[in-house]
């Protein structure tokens, strides 16, 4: 078995992704390898999307998702779009079925290059998110930042898109809040036994949401697809918007539709940056034109 595995450095609206080809191999990417790749400025990432051979009949591939701190993740919508683009460039196919820790999902690349991912159905029961204690209504829970009589943030909506999310609603620019300071505190709050993704959301019209996210295991991010989905369904659930919205994240817009069949569709772009090979055990890597390819901009790292 070859030591090195192929990879592509990509991004989904600025969400930094490494798509790793682990097909035909018995090994997995170690936490040490992930942390080493994350610490290198050229390969720094938010998530690794490791493509493995299928484990379940009817699926094309199993996708293991690894955060930049070496922990495992259940879902990554932006990373899934990157996987689709890489596989479409390789195979000529444009529709795929994947299995992740969060379940089975489907994704399609359109003629305009945008990619839609069926993110599955949202879950709202406190046990399913999960929360550490019973909450009757997850549209608004008791959690706040700041003084009790004048909280900076309070009463977030809670949802799971295969991973836990808390969405704090605000009535001014999302950039006016110090998410880098309170994000890690809220991520690790005792109410979230598996930690949580923390977002600040501002509804700017009946079909538009501005969003910033502190991503569990990754920190501040330019885009988090599952957070955009959680914000969209929570906005509809609380009467702030309809069921089809544009969510503006720092990296750009995502179109989110909460369909009548309860599935959440996310549509957005993916972009290839460069290809290489790496050692899944150590994280040692090099550029290699024979690695996974993709469409999008040229190798910006070669300039």
Curated annotation (Swiss-Prot):
GO terms for molecular function: diaminopimelate epimerase activity. The keyword Cytoplasm applies. Pathway: Amino-acid biosynthesis; L-lysine biosynthesis via DAP pathway; DL-2,6-diaminopimelate from LL-2,6-diaminopimelate: step 1/1. The active site is at residues 76, 224. It holds the Pfam family DAP_epimerase. Keywords: Amino-acid biosynthesis, Cytoplasm, Isomerase, Lysine biosynthesis. The record marks 165, 215 as: Could be important to modulate the pK values of the two catalytic cysteine residues. One of its GO terms (biological process) is lysine biosynthetic process via diaminopimelate. It catalyses: (2S,6S)-2,6-diaminopimelate = meso-2,6-diaminopimelate. It is found in: Cytoplasm. Substrate binds at residues 15, 47, 67, 77-78, 163, 197, 215-216, 225-226. Residues 278-303 are annotated as: Disordered. InterPro entries: DAP_epimerase_AS, DAP_epimerase_DapF. Its EC number is 5.1.1.7. One of its GO terms (cellular component) is cytosol. Catalyzes the stereoinversion of LL-2,6-diaminopimelate (L,L-DAP) to meso-diaminopimelate (meso-DAP), a precursor of L-lysine and an essential component of the bacterial peptidoglycan. HAMAP family: DAP_epimerase (MF_00197). Homodimer. Belongs to the diaminopimelate epimerase family. This is Diaminopimelate epimerase. The gene is dapF.
